[in-house]
Design a protein with these regions (language model features):
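Small-residue (G/A/S/T)-rich helix-start motifs and N-terminal tracts that mark the onset
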Residues: 1-116, 123-140, 145-194
Length: 194
């Protein structure tokens, strides 16, 4: 895509990444790198406090806010982060801890820009679909076949047998776009024929 000559990092897209528990800093770093490599102008990472030093050593151009496991969420900072973003990615390496779930619920309830849900966000949603209730954002689910099977409460074999059908069922069930990742990627949107 051609960029406008008058553009700058602020006009090329600002993406908020909610990723990385204390044990999964690499997920936050890799996701933020992918955001920048895809052409976004700015990335801000919301990650667990223990990831501060590794994140800034690996990706000094990233901005960041931090949360601490088993402590109250920094809600004011999160609201500012969500208002700043043009898109939000949630889930890589987030974990399924109580605090991670609270972070995901808060994000879903307060996001109005496109919301990409991946990895542990999908695992949390598979356990409690009510997480998405009241979501006003356009949702994009990006499950691999195992995550898709969990979202649909079925088997991996069933999802592999019906690639388009399983993606379509997830899109309908969660009122979202579903990008099923496997050897062949299948995309399905709610309300559209597969």
């Amino acid at each position: 895509l051609t960029r406008t000559p008058m553009g700058n990092k602020g006009t090329f897209g600002k993406v908020l990444v909610l990723a990385g528990s204390g044990a999964m800093c690499g997920a936050a770093v890799l996701c933020a790198r992918a955001v920048l490599a895809s052409g976004a102008g700015m990335v801000k990472v919301v990650t667990e406090e223990r990831n501060r030093t590794p994140l800034f050593c690996a990706l000094p151009e990233a901005m960041a806010d931090f949360w601490k496991e088993d402590e109250p969420l920094p809600e004011e900072a999160l609201l500012q982060d969500l208002a700043w973003a043009d898109a939000v990615v949630a889930g890589p390496g987030l974990s399924k801890s109580r605090t991670a779930k609270e972070l995901l619920v808060f994000t879903v309830q307060h996001t109005e820009v496109p919301l990409v849900l991946d990895a542990d966000a999908l695992n949390l949603i598979a356990e409690d679909a009510e997480i998405l209730s009241g979501c006003r954002a356009e949702k994009i689910l990006t499950p691999h076949v195992g995550e898709l099977a969990r979202l649909l409460h079925t088997t991996i074999a069933e999802c592999q047998r019906e690639p388009a059908g399983s993606a379509g069922r997830a899109a309908e069930k969660y009122q979202a776009c579903c990008v099923r990742k496997d050897s062949v990627t299948v995309t399905a949107e709610e309300g559209r024929e597969q």
